[in-house]
Regions:
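A conserved helix-loop-strand patch within extracytoplasmic ligand-binding domains
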Residues: 104-153
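A bilobed periplasmic-binding-protein/Venus flytrap-type ligand-binding module shared by bacterial periplasmic
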Residues: 111-122, 226-240
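Short, low-complexity disordered leader/linker segments with a strong preference
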Residues: 1-33
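Beta->alpha turn/N-cap motifs
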Residues: 40, 65-67, 77-91, 181-182, ...
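Ligand-binding "clamshell"
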Residues: 92-104, 118-119, 191, 196, ...
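Periplasmic-binding protein-like
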Residues: 140-148, 250-271
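Short helix-initiation/N-cap motifs at beta->coil->alpha
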Residues: 61-72, 160-187
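Short, well-ordered beta-strand elements
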Residues: 27-40, 57-63, 130-131
Length: 272
């Protein structure tokens, strides 16, 4: 009987220790949080890590080389958070794999700007000009939204943020779309009047998204959040105080400055 009582007492004590540990973690003191990223994201997170370190929160980046693993790792509890995808991708992953994960904060939109070899403003585009755009559904839809924002075409409102070429309802300059793989759009710049280029491919081809483009993407172009990148956590973790603090530490002027300087305007803050 005494042995049973001692065992029961030990279980109670252990539970109390565990609860205290969780409370400390929630307050952030001495806690380590792992966040999954893809590619070169270190510079973007440096100011966040520095700010959180002052509060005893150690933010540890876990780098993945593909886009299929971070959500599986998050859902499986291998990491605490991830930050590599936009809402459209997250929703598709949840639909496909039933992941118990959710967005807890917005980060940025990857800019898709208009570039030209010979023009300095979209107002100089002539009737019948050729326009290079990515040919895949997701990127072409964004390119069309950018062309509409630039005043070059008009789209059917019913198409939302994912229009197709068939959704063009007004093309006053009779522009000719040249659809190619997103990675090859820049290669067509000598042969077209303008090209709508993803920021990563612009950088790969020596272009500065903030300085070399003749029309720049904007968060306001889009009706919803499909193309907004995010920080994700396990379902039900949105109120975790440490995670909320990480989101707050990210959504700052310091990170916006990194977007501008280190990434040459490739990323547009989406939390404002």
């Amino acid at each position: 009987m005494k042995k049973t009582a001692l065992v029961f007492l030990w279980i109670l004590l252990a539970s109390g220790i565990s609860a205290c540990g969780k409370q400390a973690s929630a307050e952030g003191s001495g806690s380590t949080v792992t966040i999954g990223v893809v590619g070169e994201a270190q510079e973007m997170w440096d100011p966040v890590k520095e700010e959180l370190a002052k509060e005893g929160i150690n933010l540890e980046l876990v780098t993945f080389t593909d886009y299929s693993t971070p959500n599986a790792a998050l859902a499986g509890g291998e990491i605490d958070l991830n930050a590599f995808q936009h809402y459209a991708y997250l929703n598709k992953e949840i639909e496909s794999y039933s992941y118990e994960i959710e967005a807890i904060g917005d980060t940025f939109i990857s800019a898709m700007n208009i570039y030209s070899r010979n023009l300095t403003d979209v107002s100089q585009v002539q009737r019948g000009s050729k326009v290079a755009v990515p040919g895949d559904a997701s990127n072409e839809g964004r390119a069309l939204k950018v062309l509409e924002a630039a005043g070059l075409i008009a789209l059917d409102k019913k198409a939302g943020d994912s229009p197709e070429a068939a959704d063009i309802v007004d093309n006053p300059l009779q522009l000719e779309l040249v659809e190619v793989d997103a990675a090859n759009v820049c290669a067509l710049l000598p042969d077209v009047a303008i090209a709508v280029v993803n920021c990563n491919y612009a950088l790969d081809n020596g272009l500065n998204p903030g300085k070399d483009s003749i029309f720049q993407d904007s968060v306001d172009i889009y009706e919803g959040k499909n193309y907004v990148n995010l920080i994700a956590a396990g379902k039900g973790e949105a109120d975790n105080e440490v995670y909320k603090r990480i989101v707050e530490a990210y959504q700052t002027e310091a990170v916006k400055e990194v977007y501008k300087e280190a990434f040459k305007g490739s990323y547009l803050p989406a939390w404002e």
